[in-house]
């Protein structure tokens, strides 16, 4: 069964490269890679055109020849000899013409941060497929893992068709992805990306065989980019939920305020949790604190203030 031509949309950093690398490992026909112009300002001329093809930096050819390409999306694409485009105006006629020249059958997206206009959505005949790290229609928005961890909700991955809304298009495939306690955020994102990649492979194979599976989303929730106040904890949470939230969002570098017995404690990091009981609201020992939760006990380090 021949592979379809794929136009890939993503970000230079993060897990976009995980998905692209997997597609290339399959031998799939990736026709090009598109990133937002705002993500690569150091590689673009001034003024920034609607779309620009990015050349590898001067030092890159030798690194690519030696098999020492950068791990990110751009390095992965250049190592594979793919054209890489930085798009500033997705609906501009010049952008549409440049991307139409790729003759893609389908577009695949992972972590792309721009809304795709209707004219571009209509370009690939098989549509746009987006990998979203939640069980849609729950947790639409730019940081779904944060909100799933904050609310102690089941985690998962969805491949859905793109439409003009925000993460609202028909679902093509979906799977739950349970995460172990204490998993750091970057590792959780990797696991979700790999689960989404497995789904995406199946959807692409089905499309190539003429099989289209899609179901509309029902009503769902949308969460915005987190603010500082969203890092606040509650002693009314289960200790496991507080621990996993802190561990999973530690790379954000934010403090975690929590009200304990009428006083605000500022936590820097989570050390552990237990299902045991504590006979008082909290116990401090130097920079360490044990906090009674509901149920369980959270063990954390206090912020130096």
Give the label of every model feature segment.
Residues 1-252, 257, 285-304:
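One-carbon transfer enzymes
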Residues 269-284:
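A conserved acidic, glycine/proline-rich C-terminal tail/linker
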Residues 263-267, 296-299:
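Short, isolated positions in well-ordered beta-strands
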């Amino acid at each position: 069964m021949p592979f379809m031509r794929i136009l890939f949309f993503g970000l230079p950093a993060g897990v976009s490269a995980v998905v692209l690398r997997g597609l290339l490992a399959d031998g799939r026909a990736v026709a090009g890679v598109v990133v937002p112009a705002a993500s690569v300002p150091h590689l673009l001329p001034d003024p920034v055109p609607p779309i620009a093809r990015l050349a590898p930096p001067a030092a890159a050819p030798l690194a690519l020849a030696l098999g020492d390409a950068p791990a990110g999306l751009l390095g992965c694409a250049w190592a594979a000899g793919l054209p890489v485009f930085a798009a500033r105006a997705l609906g501009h006629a010049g952008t549409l013409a440049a991307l139409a020249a790729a003759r893609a059958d389908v577009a695949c997206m992972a972590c792309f941060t721009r809304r795709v206009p209707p004219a571009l959505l209509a370009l690939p005949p098989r549509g746009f497929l987006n990998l979203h790290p939640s069980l849609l229609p729950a947790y639409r928005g730019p940081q779904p893992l944060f909100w799933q961890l904050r609310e102690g909700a089941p985690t998962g991955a969805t491949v859905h068709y793109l439409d003009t809304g925000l993460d609202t298009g028909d679902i093509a495939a979906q799977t739950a992805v349970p995460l172990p306690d204490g998993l750091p955020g970057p590792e959780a994102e990797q696991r979700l990306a790999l689960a989404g990649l497995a789904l995406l492979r199946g959807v692409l194979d089905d499309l190539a065989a003429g099989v289209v599976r899609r179901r509309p989303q029902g009503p769902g929730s949308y969460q915005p980019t987190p603010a500082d106040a969203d890092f606040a904890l509650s002693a009314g949470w289960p200790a496991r939920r507080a621990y996993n939230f802190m561990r999973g969002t530690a790379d954000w570098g934010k403090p975690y305020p929590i009200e304990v017995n009428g006083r605000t404690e500022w936590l820097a990091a989570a050390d552990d949790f237990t299902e045991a009981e504590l006979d008082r609201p909290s116990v401090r020992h130097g920079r360490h604190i044990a906090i009674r939760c509901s149920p369980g006990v959270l063990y954390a380090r206090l912020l130096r203030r």
